[in-house]
Amino acid sequence: MSADSSPLVGSTPTGYGTLTIGTSIDPLSSSVSSVRLSGYCGSPWRVIGYHVVVWMMAGIPLLLFRWKPLWGVRLRLRPCNLAHAETLVIEIRDKEDSSWQLFTVQVQTEAIGEGSLEPSPQSQAEDGRSQAAVGAVPEGAWKDTAQLHKSEEAVSVGQKRVLRYYLFQGQRYIWIETQQAFYQVSLLDHGRSCDDVHRSRHGLSLQDQMVRKAIYGPNVISIPVKSYPQLLVDEALNPYYGFQAFSIALWLADHYYWYALCIFLISSISICLSLYKTRKQSQTLRDMVKLSMRVCVCRPGGEEEWVDSSELVPGDCLVLPQEGGLMPCDAALVAGECMVNESSLTGESIPVLKTALPEGLGPYCAETHRRHTLFCGTLILQARAYVGPHVLAVVTRTGFCTAKGGLVSSILHPRPINFKFYKHSMKFVAALSVLALLGTIYSIFILYRNRVPLNEIVIRALDLVTVVVPPALPAAMTVCTLYAQSRLRRQGIFCIHPLRINLGGKLQLVCFDKTGTLTEDGLDVMGVVPLKGQAFLPLVPEPRRLPVGPLLRALATCHALSRLQDTPVGDPMDLKMVESTGWVLEEEPAADSAFGTQVLAVMRPPLWEPQLQAMEEPPVPVSVLHRFPFSSALQRMSVVVAWPGATQPEAYVKGSPELVAGLCNPETVPTDFAQMLQSYTAAGYRVVALASKPLPTVPSLEAAQQLTRDTVEGDLSLLGLLVMRNLLKPQTTPVIQALRRTRIRAVMVTGDNLQTAVTVARGCGMVAPQEHLIIVHATHPERGQPASLEFLPMESPTAVNGVKDPDQAASYTVEPDPRSRHLALSGPTFGIIVKHFPKLLPKVLVQGTVFARMAPEQKTELVCELQKLQYCVGMCGDGANDCGALKAADVGISLSQAEASVVSPFTSSMASIECVPMVIREGRCSLDTSFSVFKYMALYSLTQFISVLILYTINTNLGDLQFLAIDLVITTTVAVLMSRTGPALVLGRVRPPGALLSVPVLSSLLLQMVLVTGVQLGGYFLTLAQPWFVPLNRTVAAPDNLPNYENTVVFSLSSFQYLILAAAVSKGAPFRRPLYTNVPFLVALALLSSVLVGLVLVPGLLQGPLALRNITDTGFKLLLLGLVTLNFVGAFMLESVLDQCLPACLRRLRPKRASKKRFKQLERELAEQPWPPLPAGPLR
């Protein structure tokens, strides 16, 4: 490692990002703890030495350097400072197992044109400071970015500015001279305020655009599609095929021509199919992400220019067509509104209304301002301009930095899986290699004793290595996950990362979103609770019967619906709310004649029916002047409306009851607000509060657009409560109960009200009736008092969404029973615990079941905190507000109609959580099958190893076609078909083991090999004892001394053993269906067994090709079949005894070791001491 190895994580200057760790360039999916970057540059003497070594060793080092590129870099280049590096070595360490991944990249340079880095005067701040400095970095840092490295070459060409950068997994990292480090290219929305984004609406000059393109690169998501010759070289130089080539050469030298030819043909066909599939997949992915179109951009001075989408850079201002179309980049909407279909990215099938980004000094963030951001790859269904002639959007991200680029990157560079099974499998292969070495030493000794020529000894000894280390093991293991992936696809569950299927079998906890996941998507309006003065009126079941007034107008206008092809579209709750009023949405891009100015939309009342309306005169249409769309973080939305005859416009706010009440004038909030809210939420209803506020007169739509959200959403007057019924899906309760029976924790993570979430949790069985539920309530530090934390029993009337009655709180007692306690808390409480009570957080997480009012980023944080406790975490949601959590989870399942989603490795087309147990059952089946296949491949290799060693002892071996029959006809057939067994129909409590190097697995391998060895040696010695036995001529080496009796007996017995072992390790329960359900596998076993029985009794036509000696003694043939039967019974008895008796014996001999997982340790601690502390006073 170079002395100049620089960490890429740490403090960074404003506007710049560090190297985002993780294979998908996503901090949320990061699984690394540190990254190091080392620089290397050219050295003439090292280059000469490099070529000498390669030439003297006949090019073999080139192959090694392809597998180990760091070796080649260190031999050819010398370590140097990063400022002068030509090649970089990136080392990424996994935080869980401390393993390192190495990557090498080339530093590239590019001359930057003479165009100015300053923007046009229109986009300058009032103080003259340039706002086009991408990322709004501190003054001077932008010029460092473009520098603006003056190299010796630059001097010779007139001091041209040269940019140094490198590309890693699609992302571009640039050299910052003043920081002496590489940083990910800064994005426009990083560190920039919303006002800065709005100032960019004038666009970039052509010169500035060219400079930025040199820095950001073209706006393309480039998928390399290699030619067939390139793919052939890559595939042929794979270590697997390198071992195959070595083996084929060895077999040819040993005169195994037929076997070598067949393996060569099979390997060639495999390579060709792999090349075709790889290229086809690359082409399909390239065609899927390829997006090239002509777009219109603004230029300074009011000009417009049509350019190719690949020319776009952050800072360009797009003019969006009214008919919509695909978005070629990520952009912030600064003028107009767009109706967008984001199903390809988030899985949200409902069109989303995007509104113009509000101005302000707050920083712009694509995630925070999702409702104002258009993402690359999404489809704009329609665009409407209200202020000005055009719908405008400022480009914020291009290429791989976009949302679509993130999806492609996650496919191209999936996050590495830290799974014990895969590590143990590598260790086991290494152990087999050691065994091969021991066998080689033994064979050398035996062959030397038998006076075999030296060249024959070398060939035979190396041949033993090809027997012990099974080259087909990776392919056999891959087949398991492919079968599982295919079965999931048939059930409507699509997986873009097949290796994650096995992780599904190890899930210990699953988080669920509520709305649309546990409950129905649609909501039914139960009624409205109006407010008169400071008192609630009785529930009005039909909102259309409300008198004309602020509450009715709020219900009719406070939404983000839009018309698409004459049909209202938008959030289902908004649709139901408006439908209950009977009002009709009309969108008028022209001026509203009734109001006298241009408006966003008009809500028209139904035909006047005096007998149904509590009103004296018919209602009038209401015009919407401005919308502040719903924000998950703010938990509310608002509109500004006006109508003919109104003296001043009004603002209507709709959102979380607790939050809206907090924004209202306390004099307008009834004293029984909390009790009224609880009466509905405790029954499982969803409650939304509505409030209003008169505003100063705004003469036009343009003036309304200047209003800030803080101005509109403050000092409100509470109007009433909208009560909606959100029913559980019929599949929810059975699934939750099934998970709990199998000891898989079910956790609810929702943005809904805490009381509603608790009611749903009890209704679906997350919290059983006899189990205690405790509310966790925290308060921020204030007035010199530290933050406090209280635990309040849910049965107590004191716990109503954090509002407590101190007179009754202390009188309630609960018998301590930690095993049946569940905690419920809100997002604000979760944030306080994370910040002020970090030591208590693990205990809260271990017992937490309901997490309500959680913002999207808090959902992600919760999943990550659970993973820190070493839970294998699943997450199931609809993909709308769960994107981060779905990506961060070990197994994320998005409920969507799309086949692939950016948010998760699994996408289910079924709209219920039934997919969760399906994924778990398939994961357990796949993992258990992987164990079986691995055991079988190891046993197959060891069985053949024993056969060869026995025959080597007498200076013979298996024949050419005998090897072919064993490896291709018998072993390959059963290894492929044994993986077809489907998953068990019911989830059990036991999880499949994750460790391959465990006592049960190793005991099974050892005892089965003892049995195999005993049967083969028994058959061999029985043959020697027969009166008709004629020893082979040991002076002649194999295969020239074939056929002989010893070979015939060993081959016949071992052939049966491959079938017996395949059947013995293919047990069904508890993770797979019974063996008899795998019909193709049983048919193959029956056919192959019949052929082998016929081969023993009546060799017939196969005797000659297989080089078998004819045994005429029928009694001896039956004796051989008796040995086979004994082997069959013994193998199954061994597996049965090991499955049923070994665990009990191990428990008696050695007490079960306590799990080292962090959450298990916490569970034991909580079981030994009463926790949490119940009302004895708050913790501070």
From Swiss-Prot:
<feature type="topological domain" description="Lumenal">
    <location>
        <begin position="254"/>
        <end position="256"/>
    </location>
</feature>
<feature type="glycosylation site" description="N-linked (GlcNAc...) asparagine">
    <location>
        <position position="1033"/>
    </location>
</feature>
<dbReference type="GO" id="GO:1904714">
    <property type="term" value="P:regulation of chaperone-mediated autophagy"/>
</dbReference>
<dbReference type="GO" id="GO:0031902">
    <property type="term" value="C:late endosome membrane"/>
</dbReference>
<dbReference type="GO" id="GO:0006914">
    <property type="term" value="P:autophagy"/>
</dbReference>
<dbReference type="GO" id="GO:0043523">
    <property type="term" value="P:regulation of neuron apoptotic process"/>
</dbReference>
<dbReference type="GO" id="GO:1905037">
    <property type="term" value="P:autophagosome organization"/>
</dbReference>
<dbReference type="GO" id="GO:0033157">
    <property type="term" value="P:regulation of intracellular protein transport"/>
</dbReference>
<dbReference type="GO" id="GO:0034599">
    <property type="term" value="P:cellular response to oxidative stress"/>
</dbReference>
<feature type="transmembrane region" description="Helical">
    <location>
        <begin position="257"/>
        <end position="276"/>
    </location>
</feature>
<feature type="transmembrane region" description="Helical">
    <location>
        <begin position="1081"/>
        <end position="1101"/>
    </location>
</feature>
<dbReference type="Pfam" id="PF12409">
    <property type="entry name" value="P5-ATPase"/>
</dbReference>
<dbReference type="GO" id="GO:0030145">
    <property type="term" value="F:manganese ion binding"/>
</dbReference>
<feature type="topological domain" description="Cytoplasmic">
    <location>
        <begin position="66"/>
        <end position="235"/>
    </location>
</feature>
<dbReference type="GO" id="GO:1903543">
    <property type="term" value="P:positive regulation of exosomal secretion"/>
</dbReference>
<feature type="topological domain" description="Cytoplasmic">
    <location>
        <begin position="1"/>
        <end position="44"/>
    </location>
</feature>
<feature type="transmembrane region" description="Helical">
    <location>
        <begin position="995"/>
        <end position="1015"/>
    </location>
</feature>
<dbReference type="GO" id="GO:0006874">
    <property type="term" value="P:intracellular calcium ion homeostasis"/>
</dbReference>
<dbReference type="GO" id="GO:0010821">
    <property type="term" value="P:regulation of mitochondrion organization"/>
</dbReference>
<keyword id="KW-1278">Translocase</keyword>
<dbReference type="InterPro" id="IPR023298">
    <property type="entry name" value="ATPase_P-typ_TM_dom_sf"/>
</dbReference>
<dbReference type="GO" id="GO:1900180">
    <property type="term" value="P:regulation of protein localization to nucleus"/>
</dbReference>
<dbReference type="GO" id="GO:0005524">
    <property type="term" value="F:ATP binding"/>
</dbReference>
<dbReference type="GO" id="GO:1903146">
    <property type="term" value="P:regulation of autophagy of mitochondrion"/>
</dbReference>
<keyword id="KW-0472">Membrane</keyword>
<keyword id="KW-0458">Lysosome</keyword>
<dbReference type="GO" id="GO:1905165">
    <property type="term" value="P:regulation of lysosomal protein catabolic process"/>
</dbReference>
<dbReference type="GO" id="GO:0005770">
    <property type="term" value="C:late endosome"/>
</dbReference>
<dbReference type="GO" id="GO:0006879">
    <property type="term" value="P:intracellular iron ion homeostasis"/>
</dbReference>
<dbReference type="GO" id="GO:0071287">
    <property type="term" value="P:cellular response to manganese ion"/>
</dbReference>
<comment type="similarity">
    <text>Belongs to the cation transport ATPase (P-type) (TC 3.A.3) family. Type V subfamily.</text>
</comment>
<keyword id="KW-0460">Magnesium</keyword>
<dbReference type="GO" id="GO:0097734">
    <property type="term" value="P:extracellular exosome biogenesis"/>
</dbReference>
<keyword id="KW-0547">Nucleotide-binding</keyword>
<dbReference type="GO" id="GO:0007041">
    <property type="term" value="P:lysosomal transport"/>
</dbReference>
<dbReference type="GO" id="GO:0015417">
    <property type="term" value="F:ABC-type polyamine transporter activity"/>
</dbReference>
<dbReference type="GO" id="GO:2000152">
    <property type="term" value="P:regulation of ubiquitin-specific protease activity"/>
</dbReference>
<keyword id="KW-0325">Glycoprotein</keyword>
<keyword id="KW-0479">Metal-binding</keyword>
<dbReference type="GO" id="GO:0050714">
    <property type="term" value="P:positive regulation of protein secretion"/>
</dbReference>
<keyword id="KW-0968">Cytoplasmic vesicle</keyword>
<dbReference type="GO" id="GO:0034220">
    <property type="term" value="P:monoatomic ion transmembrane transport"/>
</dbReference>
